[in-house]
Amino acid sequence: MKPIVFLGRKGLSRMKKKVIHGSVATCCAAVAAATGAVTVTPTGRYMAVPVENGAPKVMLEVFDGGRRVAYDQIEWARGVTNWTGSLDLGAAKGRPFEFRFSGKDAPNLSAADLAFSDSRYPAPKGQYGEPWRPQFHFTPPLGWNNDPNGLSCRNGEWHMFYQHNPFGITWGNMHWGHAVSKDLVHWNDQGDVIAPDDAGPMFSGSAVTDAADTAGFGKGAHVLVYTAAGKPHTQRVAWSLDGRNYAKWPHAAVEGRADANRDPKVGWYAPGKHWTMVVYGEVEKKRHGVSIFVSKDLKTWEKASHVKGDLFDEGKYLYECPDFFELPIEGEKGTRWVLTAANRQYAIGTFDGRTFTPEVERLAQWRSPGNVNPVYAAQTFADVPDGRRIQVAWSHFDTRAGGRADAMFNQGMSLPMELKLVRAADGLRLARFPVKELESLRAGAPTPLAGFNGELAEVEFSCEPVADSVVALDVRGVAIVYDAVKRTLALNGKAVAWDLDARGRLGLRVFVDRVGVEIFSLDGLQYVPAPDIVPDPAKRKMSWRASGAKKPVRGVTERAWRLKSIFADR
């Protein structure tokens, strides 16, 4: 099914002059027009959708020969057009489509209100230089994103799909956006690959490479497993042989079996030569949890077991977006399985191919100053050739903050991080590290903090604080303060508990973007994401100081790199 369209009152006849940002759009031939509906023969694959942030929403349904092929709610521009979305009509060119729109503010349209193009409508020049767009984190070119989906590596190419609203900068109209990368750092957006259909909006899921063609789609097919969020929710499958064009399998792989079920994560269990799927599922509208299914062919699934989470009135352990993977224990023989969920909590245990047995539960993946969930719905890449387990999470920051009504996108993703399973003082724990590929963004040799002058930065700082000291870093106006008495680290005044390493040293690795800060410490065991912190654009310097004793710190090491934007060529 293809994306969706909403048509404006005065619409594209005027918009073509103001909004298409220099792209060439052709008009269309109208067969008939009536209040609430117009039949048009599109002259291109993509229809321009003018978006006015905050405008009243209208529902548009698109019909091809009586079959509904698209539907969405759109903040269709009535005054100022903030940006232009692209409705993919697929092979629509040359035959009539009916566009029906409804709602309190539904417009009356004619053929002259619509414009089409054979290519997606481009973003305006300079879009990636927006003052509120991160410069080395992934963000959608246009529209809203939330959960990362379908993270996978195939034929030397990294794939990141994501929950996407292509026609607004708030949640809704869930499609799967798609971006690809050769290095995990620079991403090229490919447009949406699956769109809402009669089974429902396209909620979260995963992707695998079916090397042995167990599903019969073709050897090496790239298979997406996702939730269609109709009533009831169902788990469904789409596939591609070229990694660009995806077709939906017309049946449900898993029918709705609980009050709510969604967000399938699929993996290959080699000892049993079968696929596994973990799916979030509510039980009797009382308890969160994760169900485990098994399959030989990615199409037919058997429920094998269930892992209980919190009761609704207790908390959100095992709530939404599960991930499930095996990791070797660093420096030891053996492995363990890790089960994560959307709101940072995870469990470590054993798995026999059908049943997960937790050994320790309700562990925290990250620390959160102020915002309980600064990042959410973390997922890991499948089929990574070198065996690394790499995670990306949805970063919460609002481009509308501070009264910015003209934003063309909203939200983004965390840095990609390599996960390892280590034995810490209190048992097995996940540790995380920025992927090595990020080092390619370093621009020249590092300097001491006092010698830094720039916008984008990576900072390494280490020292041994004495018992009553306070160590403060000023990183482009962002205050990072360690208090040895309180044993806390504060980020712009919001503190979290903080541990020193076994040698009594404070070690920080800090990434500073145009929007957002991420801190790694304690050999990967401490991670603080702060995507909503905005460094002062006028402040480009760094410094540090220590107080509280005659010699408050020992053994200081420090260095800072300027980082390059991933959009330097755009």
PLM regions with names:
Residues 161-188:
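Beta-propeller domains
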Residues 157-160, 215-224, 272-277, 333-338, ...:
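Entry beta-strands of beta-propeller and related beta-repeat scaffolds
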Residues 35-122:
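Extracytoplasmic
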Residues 181, 238-240, 292-298, 350:
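Conserved Ser/Thr-centered positions that define the repeating blades of beta-propeller domains
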Residues 68-87, 109-149, 168-171, 186-219, ...:
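Surface loop/turn signatures of beta-propeller and other carbohydrate-active proteins
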Residues 166-169, 229-232, 282-285, 398-399:
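Short glycine/acidic-enriched loop and turn motifs that connect beta-strands
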Residues 173-175, 232-236, 286-291, 345-350:
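Structural motif
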Residues 38-50, 56-66, 100-103, 343-345, ...:
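Beta-rich accessory regions
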